[in-house]
């Protein structure tokens, strides 16, 4: 009897342990695509549609999209948007098509450049597939330099895009329904895991209507590159095949990093995108600095932003991007850049300094820990926090807000152009929540150097 009772107790204990193990939290994969399942195969229907600004965003923009290989040199149709379904005879632009082979099969990625548009005009446009078309999308061209502008800035998305980036993008669009431009500070996907195309599919799914409602300008991150000949004397960084075909970016970058650097004008703002990975790992920092000097030196506008993936002043322990500070930082200071927007370190930190204002942010699921140096030199800082940023330009005032995934205000300041006195930073503390710190000892994978992954 006792023996039977003991066996029953042991079986019950084992069953309870098994139940706990079955419901225990486990690390989530980067994509929701189960092994052996093909979720993002290209078809004759256009997908991964994204608009990006032309060099002059008042008179043009470009569109990239994807289909299967049956579609070659398809059309983009564009017309001034109207209230009737009959918007008139559209203009037709023929796209250039590029083949890309991935784990999801072969696809054609298309690019159409639209020029000759009228400023501050709402256009309707659609792209062609195999005997079919996309929906009609709306894009408004940039207005006069004196017009207000609202834009969004996202740090790294990178991991678990559909699972956890989606909610941040939705919250951002709720808080900035009038935004016309979105900047992404690199590492849009993780890559290098045999699921690169699945990850890009999830990035577009997570961003939903944003890439066809706003114009999108991304910076390349180190995860947009891969290591070729790894662990050999020939090891080197190589730009991934998706980057040049996924976005239709301005082709005005420095020759040594032509596909990953560019600039454009949007109303009273010039945005210059540099490639930190190329600067640090491929020796192009000096060339990029000379090009940046020209791009900023010819800026006729009141405002300027430089965006790069790797920070000039890193808030994460153990990272120090010396080549950026040596070659590119003097150019940024010389031209009195207003904002330097960065990612890479998966925390939030704003350097305590007058303009230029250096900001590092993160949108995605991967969360690192702050260094002691960052806690001394940056304010505010944050760990374990998904964020988006809203920037509003109106005349002599730039208003910046960093908000959490639930929309709570985390950081806010104004830059005010006082004419001869230059740009002055005005802190806005009302309504901000308290600084956030990671309270977990380690991640689900047992890593103490990260807060979440």
Positions of predicted regions on the chain:
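Acidic/histidine-rich helix-loop elements
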Residues: 82-109, 152-167, 190-192, 234-237, ...
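Active-site metal-binding loops of divalent metal-dependent hydrolases
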Residues: 129, 154-159, 186-188, 222-223, ...
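Short acidic, glycine-rich surface-loop motifs adjacent to enzyme active sites
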Residues: 185, 189, 299-316
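Acidic, histidine-bearing metal-coordination/catalytic regions of metal-dependent phosphoesterases
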Residues: 19-153, 174-177, 384, 390-453
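Active-site-proximal beta-strand elements of phosphoester/diester hydrolases
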Residues: 148-158, 268-278, 305-309, 356-363, ...
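Extended active-site neighborhood of metal-dependent phosphoesterases/phosphodiesterases
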Residues: 111-113, 122-138, 198-300, 319, ...
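Bacterial N-terminal signal peptides
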Residues: 4-14
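Conserved, compact domain cores that house catalytic/ligand-binding motifs in diverse enzymes
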Residues: 149-219, 224-225
């Amino acid at each position: 009897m006792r023996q039977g009772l003991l066996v029953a107790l042991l079986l019950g204990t084992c069953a309870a342990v098994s139940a706990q193990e079955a419901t225990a939290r486990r690390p989530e994969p980067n994509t929701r695509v189960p092994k052996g399942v093909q979720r993002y195969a290209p078809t004759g229907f256009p997908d991964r549609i994204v608009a990006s600004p032309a060099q002059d965003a008042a008179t043009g923009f470009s569109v990239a999209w994807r289909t299967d290989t049956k579609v070659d040199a398809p059309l983009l149709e564009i017309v001034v948007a109207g209230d009737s379904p009959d918007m008139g005879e559209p203009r037709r632009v023929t796209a250039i098509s590029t083949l890309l082979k991935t784990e999801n099969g072969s696809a054609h990625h298309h690019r159409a450049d639209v020029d000759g548009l009228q400023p501050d005009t709402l256009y309707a446009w659609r792209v062609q597939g195999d005997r079919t078309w996309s929906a009609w999308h709306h894009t408004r061209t940039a207005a006069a330099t004196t017009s207000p502008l609202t834009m969004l800035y996202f740090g790294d998305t990178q991991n678990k895009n559909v699972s956890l980036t989606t909610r941040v993008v939705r919250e951002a669009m709720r808080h900035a329904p009038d935004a016309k431009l979105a900047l992404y500070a690199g590492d849009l996907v993780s890559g290098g895991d045999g699921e690169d195309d699945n990850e890009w599919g999830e990035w577009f799914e997570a961003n939903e209507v944003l890439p066809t409602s706003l114009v999108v300008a991304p910076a390349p991150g180190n995860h947009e590159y891969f290591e070729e000949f790894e662990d050999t004397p020939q090891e080197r960084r190589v730009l991934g095949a998706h980057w040049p075909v996924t976005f239709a970016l301005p082709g005005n970058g420095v020759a040594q990093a032509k596909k990953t650097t560019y600039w454009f004008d949007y109303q009273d703002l010039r945005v210059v995108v540099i490639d930190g990975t190329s600067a640090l790992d491929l020796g192009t920092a000096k060339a990029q600095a000379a090009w940046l000097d020209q791009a900023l030196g010819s800026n006729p506008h009141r405002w300027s932003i430089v965006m790069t993936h790797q920070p000039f002043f890193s808030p994460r322990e153990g990272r120090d991007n010396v080549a950026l500070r040596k070659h590119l930082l003097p150019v940024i200071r010389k031209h009195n850049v207003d904002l330097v927007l960065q990612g890479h370190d998966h925390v939030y930190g704003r350097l305590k300094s007058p303009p230029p204002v250096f900001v590092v942010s993160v949108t995605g699921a991967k969360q690192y820990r702050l260094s002691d140096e960052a806690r001394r030199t940056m304010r505010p800082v944050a760990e374990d926090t998904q964020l988006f940023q809203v920037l509003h330009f109106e005349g002599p005032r730039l208003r910046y807000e960093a908000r959490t995934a639930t929309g709570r205000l985390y950081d806010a300041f104004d830059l005010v152009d006082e004419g001869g006195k230059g740009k002055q930073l005005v802190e806005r503390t009302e309504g901000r929540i308290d600084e956030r710190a990671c309270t977990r000892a380690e991640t689900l994978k047992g890593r103490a150097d990260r807060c979440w992954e």
